[in-house]
């Protein structure tokens, strides 16, 4: 892979003569059940990366890491545009356009993409990964270990760019975010994700929940992890509190939102002990009762 001459402005080529010699050597290829980019789910599917034999030595000691960054060359991408309308943005006007360096669109001058993935297992030169959003046959240009000490920035925030396609899409996104923080998908985590999904879709019109204060049951550790992750509340900043009652409370602007467990006589922990798939399958009216109250200034 070399940079095509017609993609290099003449003034840039004269000032930086080395730029035309930039070369990317594919080190492997993606093997995925999805071959059409239009059919790829937002968060990808289980896939594998086959490293070419001549790069096998580069995999030595990769087993020390649970997650990796996969850098790929999006060979089907449009390299001619610098402005795009991101997924989820309904405004087709100039106001809806974003620069390609401000979004994760495959459209960009150098279509290098990166995705973090969990290593399920390594078989020879084949990496089996929990999910990749690259289509079958995508060239891989690099593999790097994911380091918690330098790659995880828990204080990072992003202004919302687009609107989730629907409630299910939002729930899937929240579950993945919470699982990345907590380490596994359990009942308590799923319960927390369902509460936050309802809160955002019903009361916030799908907007992000950053800046929300939360009060959570003190004995529901997995649910606490979900709420911390998904609304950005923490004890250290005074935005996360605890109590002994079976309900979650969100406080935002001039309103209070209560989520009360709908199973009288049962402890909250008995719900969170259920498997995640059970929590996700139950109708929300069987899990909680939600209400919103205006807080009047005194």
What does each model-identified segment do?
Residues 100, 118, 247-249:
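Residue-level detector of beta-strand face positions
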Residues 48-84, 187-232:
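Short, well-structured hydrophobic secondary-structure segments
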Residues 2-115, 122-165:
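Glycine-rich, low-complexity intrinsically disordered segments
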Residues 165-185, 196-298:
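Non-transmembrane, aqueous-exposed alpha-helical and coiled segments at domain scale
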């Amino acid at each position: 892979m070399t940079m095509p001459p017609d993609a290099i402005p003449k003034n840039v080529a004269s000032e930086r003569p080395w730029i035309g010699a930039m070369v990317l050597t594919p080190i492997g290829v993606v093997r995925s059940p999805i071959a059409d980019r239009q059919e790829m789910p937002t968060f990808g599917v289980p896939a594998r990366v086959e490293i070419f034999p001549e790069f096998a030595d580069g995999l030595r000691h990769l087993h020390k890491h649970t997650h990796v960054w996969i850098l790929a060359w999006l060979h089907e991408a449009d390299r001619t545009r610098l402005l795009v309308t991101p997924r989820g943005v309904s405004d087709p006007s100039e106001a809806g356009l974003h620069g390609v360096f401000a979004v994760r669109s495959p459209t960009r001058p150098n279509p290098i993409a990166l995705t973090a993935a969990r290593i399920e297992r390594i078989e020879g030169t084949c990496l089996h990964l929990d999910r990749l959003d690259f289509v079958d046959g995508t060239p891989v240009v690099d593999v790097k270990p994911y380091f918690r000490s330098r790659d995880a920035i828990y204080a990072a925030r992003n202004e919302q760019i687009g609107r989730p396609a629907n409630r299910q899409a939002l729930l899937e996104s929240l579950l993945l975010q919470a699982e990345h923080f907590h380490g596994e998908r359990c009942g308590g985590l799923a319960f927390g994700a369902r509460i936050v999904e309802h809160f955002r879709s019903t009361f916030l019109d799908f907007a992000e929940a950053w800046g929300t204060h939360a009060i959570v049951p003190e004995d529901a550790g997995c649910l606490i992890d979900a709420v911390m992750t998904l609304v950005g509340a923490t004890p250290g900043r005074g935005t996360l509190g605890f109590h002994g009652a079976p309900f979650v409370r969100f406080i935002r602007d001039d309103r209070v939102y209560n989520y009360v467990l709908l199973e009288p006589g049962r402890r909250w922990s008995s719900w969170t002990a259920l498997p995640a798939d059970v929590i996700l399958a139950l109708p929300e009216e069987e899990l909680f009762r939600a209400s919103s109250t205006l807080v009047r200034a005194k």
